[in-house]
A protein has these predicted regions:
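Short acidic/histidine-rich active-site segments
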Residues: 170-175
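Catalytic phosphate/nucleotide-handling subdomain of diverse soluble enzymes
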Residues: 185-187
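Hydrophobic alpha-helical bundle signature of multipass membrane enzymes
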Residues: 1-169, 190-193, 200, 211
Length: 218
C-alpha cells in the first residue's frame, strides 16, 4: 500500500537494541532461555508453524482466532487486505533500523541451532532488530480486530503469540519482538491515512458483514 518514504522511520522511532552486559540484554537472554524450554512443547510446534509466512501461512495462522477461514476462495477481500499489508509491515516499517544496526540474531550469538534451521542462512544476513515477523503479525492482528470486533480478544492474543513465537524459535530477542510491535502500530496508524488501504479495508468489512449475516462466522 505504501512507499518507503511514507512509513515512519524505525531508526528514528526506536532506541538502540540492548547491548550485551546491560540489564535489558540480561532480560533478552532470560527470554531466550525461556523460549528454548518451550520448543519441545505444543507451543514450540506452533512457533515453528508461525515462522511460515509464505503462501497461506499468515492467513492460516489467524483463521481460528478470526472465526472463519481466511483464504482467496472464501474471503478474497480480507485475504487481499492482509496480503498487501505484509511488505508494508515486515519490510518498510522495520528496514531502517534493521539495516543500520544489523543486530546478530540469538542463534548466532549463542552458537546454538534455532527451531527453524532451514531459515538460518538467510536470517544470518538480515538484522534481528526489530522483528519483521512480529510486525507483520501485530499489524495483521490490529486490522483483523477492527473487522471482527466481537473476537478482538482472540485476534489480538494470537497476534501477540505470533511475535513470541520468534523468541521461542531463537531467531529474535524479546527486545526485537517488542520493537516490532511498536513499528507495526505506527504502520497501521499510517495505513489508515492511505486511500488505497481504506478502500480495501471497507471492502473487507463489507465482505465480513455478509459472511456474519449468513451465519458463517463463529
Amino acid at each position: 500500500f505504501l512507499k518507503p518514504d511514507q512509513v515512519a522511520n524505525s531508526l528514528e522511532l526506536l532506541p538502540p537494541p540492548p547491548q550485551p552486559g546491560s540489564a535489558q540484554f540480561n532480560y533478552d537472554e532470560a527470554q531466550y532461555k525461556w523460549g528454548k524450554m518451550q520448543r519441545i512443547t505444543p507451543r514450540g510446534k506452533q512457533a515453528a508453524e508461525d515462522a511460515n509466512l509464505g503462501g497461506v501461512g499468515l492467513s492460516n495462522a489467524f483463521s481460528e482466532a478470526f472465526g472463519i477461514k481466511i483464504s482467496k476462495e472464501e474471503t478474497p477481500e480480507i485475504y487481499t487486505l492482509i496480503s498487501r499489508m505484509q511488505e508494508d509491515a515486515g519490510d518498510l516499517s522495520t528496514r531502517s533500523a534493521k539495516n543500520y544496526y544489523m543486530r546478530m540474531r540469538p542463534f548466532m550469538l549463542f552458537g546454538e541451532q534455532s527451531l527453524t534451521p532451514g531459515a538460518e542462512k538467510w536470517l544470518a544476513t538480515n538484522g534481528s532488530y526489530p522483528s519483521g515477523h512480529t510486525a507483520i503479525g501485530w499489524a495483521t492482528a490490529l486490522v483483523l480486530a477492527e473487522i471482527n470486533i466481537d473476537r478482538q480478544n482472540e485476534i489480538l492474543k494470537r497476534g501477540f503469540e505470533f511475535g513470541q513465537s520468534r523468541v521461542i524459535c531463537g531467531v529474535h530477542y524479546q527486545s526485537d519482538v517488542d520493537a516490532g510491535r511498536v513499528v507495526a502500530s505506527g504502520l497501521v496508524a499510517r495505513l489508515h491515512a492511505d486511500e488505497g488501504f481504506c478502500t480495501q479495508l471497507a471492502k473487507a468489512k463489507k465482505e465480513f458483514a455478509k459472511l456474519k449475516k449468513a451465519g458463517k462466522v463463529k
